[in-house]
Design a protein with these regions (language model features):
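Mid-domain Rossmann-like dinucleotide-binding core that forms the NAD(H)/NADP(H) cofactor-binding site
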Residues: 165-225
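C-terminal capping/lid region of NAD(P)-dependent oxidoreductase domains
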Residues: 245, 315-332
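Glycine-rich helix-loop-beta junction characteristic of Rossmann-like nucleotide cofactor-binding loops
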Residues: 183-189, 244-245, 266-267
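NAD(P)H dinucleotide-binding glycine-rich loop of Rossmann-like/cofactor-binding domains
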Residues: 91, 118-192
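Adenosine-nucleotide cofactor-binding segment
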Residues: 200-259
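Glycine-rich phosphate-binding loop and adjacent beta-alpha segment
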Residues: 255-320
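Conserved "cap/hinge" positions at secondary-structure junctions
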Residues: 101, 122-124, 128, 197, ...
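Glycine-rich beta-strand-centered segment in the early N-terminal region that forms part
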Residues: 33-48, 59-124
Length: 332
C-alpha cells in the first residue's frame, strides 16, 4: 500500500494545538509505526541537548543523572519531542537513516540513502522523537546517548557525518553551526569584538579562570577576561579596561544562563552590533534594558540556519588545528 503524503513542514504530526507548526506545538505525534511518503525515519544514537535547556534540567534535578534521565524521558513521553517546557528549546540528534519515504526518494537532488550517518540541523523542539532507552548521560557536554527513533520532515535540514573527523567532534560543532556562519558576516576589519561565554581586537569573557590559558593558546583572542556575565557592570568595567577604555563595535553573547543581556549591551557603543546566540536570551530584558540605558544598538537574534552553515562550521575546525584540538579534548 502506498504511503500517505504529509505536509512538508510536518503539520500532519501536530496533535495540539491544531493550526501551528511542530516547534510551537505542545504535543506532536511520535508514532513511528506510521510513516509518510515525505518523511525520513532515523535510528537515533545521541541527543545533543541545547545548553540552556540541559543546564535548566540539570539544576532542577540537582545534577543527579538518574533524575535528569527521568525528566528527559518524561518530557518526550508527554510531548512527543524533546522540548524543555521551561526554556522552550531542544537540541539536535545524531543517528542513522533507517527509512526514506517514497516521494523523497524521487525528489530531484535528494542525496540520502538508508544507512547514512547524519546529524540533524533542526531543533529537537520540533522533531518527533521516541526514546526506547537512555544509555548514558554526559553532563559535562550536554549529551545523552540513547536507543530511539526520530522523524525528519521534507523541509528538515541535516548534514552527513564527515569522514575526516570523529562523530563526537562533528556533533559538537554542528550543534551550533548557525553561530560561526552568521558571526563571520558581522565584524569589519579593525572592529573591536567582545565575546561573552567564550569558553581589530577580540576579547573573550569567561567565569572560570582555568579556561583562560586554553583560550589564549588558540591565537584568536587579544585578551580573555574573567567576569560573571550576570553582573553587567562588572563585565563592562573589565571589558573596557581590556580595550583601552574604548567601547566595542560588536559583542556576541553565547552564554547558556539567564540575565546576561545587559552584559552584552553595556560595553557596545551607539550604532554598534549585539548578537545573541543563546536560548537563554530574553527579548524583553534586551529590548527594555537597552532602552533604559539609552543605547542605540542593533540587536540580532541568532538564527540556527545560514546558507552552507554546516560546511562553514566544519571548515573552521579543519583550518584551525588548535581549535580542533580543544574540541577533541572537550567532546571526544
Amino acid at each position: 500500500m502506498a504511503e500517505l503524503k504529509g505536509n512538508k513542514y510536518g503539520t500532519h504530526r501536530v496533535i495540539e494545538p491544531k493550526g501551528v507548526l511542530t516547534q510551537a506545538a505542545w504535543k506532536v505525534d511520535n508514532d513511528m509505526s506510521k510513516v509518510y511518503s515525505n518523511e525520513i525515519v532515523c535510528d537515533v544514537t545521541s541527543l545533543n541537548i541545547d545548553s540552556a535547556s540541559f543546564t535548566q534540567i540539570s539544576d532542577a534535578c540537582g545534577g543527579d543523572e538518574k533524575k535528569i534521565g527521568e525528566m528527559i524521558l518524561g518530557i518526550v513521553a508527554e510531548r512527543g519531542k524533546q522540548q524543555n517546557p521551561v526554556t522552550g528549546s531542544g537540541g539536535m540528534f545524531k543517528g542513522v537513516v533507517a527509512h526514506i519515504g517514497e516521494d523523497l526518494k524521487k525528489k530531484p537532488g535528494f542525496d540520502l540513502k538508508e544507512g547514512d550517518k547524519i546529524v540533524s540541523l533542526v531543533s529537537l523542539s520540533m522533531t518527533p522523537l521516541k526514546i526506547e532507552k537512555i544509555l548514558s548521560i554526559h553532563k559535562d557536554i550536554d549529551r545523552v546517548d540513547i536507543v530511539g527513533k526520530a522523524i525528519l520532515f521534507e523541509s528538515a535540514l541535516y548534514a552527513k557525518m564527515p569522514e575526516d573527523m570523529s562523530e563526537p567532534l562533528a556533533l559538537a560543532a554542528l550543534d551550533v553551526a548557525g553561530a560561526p556562519a552568521q558571526a563571520r558576516k558581522l565584524p569589519k576589519e579593525g572592529d573591536s569584538v567582545l565575546i561573552l561565554g567564550a569558553n581589530g581586537k577580540v576579547v573573550g569573557v569567561v567565569r572560570n579562570p582555568k579556561q583562560v590559558p586554553g583560550l589564549l593558546e588558540l591565537g584568536v583572542y587579544t585578551d580573555v577576561i574573567v567576569a560573571d556575565c550576570t553582573k553587567p557592570v562588572e563585565v563592562m568595567e573589565a571589558a573596557l579596561a581590556a580595550n583601552d577604555g574604548k567601547e566595542y563595535d560588536l559583542s556576541i553573547c553565547c552564554v547558556n544562563i539567564e540575565s546576561c543581556e545587559m552584559s552584552a549591551i553595556l560595553p557596545v557603543h551607539d550604532d554598534g552590533l549585539v548578537y545573541f546566540f543563546s536560548m537563554a536570551t530574553s527579548f524583553t530584558k534586551a529590548a527594555l534594558g537597552a532602552e533604559g540605558i539609552g543605547k542605540d544598538v542593533t540587536m540580532i537574534i541568532g538564527n540556527g540556519y545560514t546558507k552552507n552553515h554546516a560546511q562553514i562550521t566544519l571548515d573552521v575546525l579543519r583550518e584551525n588545528p588548535k581549535l580542533r584540538k580543544l574540541f577533541d579534548e572537550k567532546y571526544c
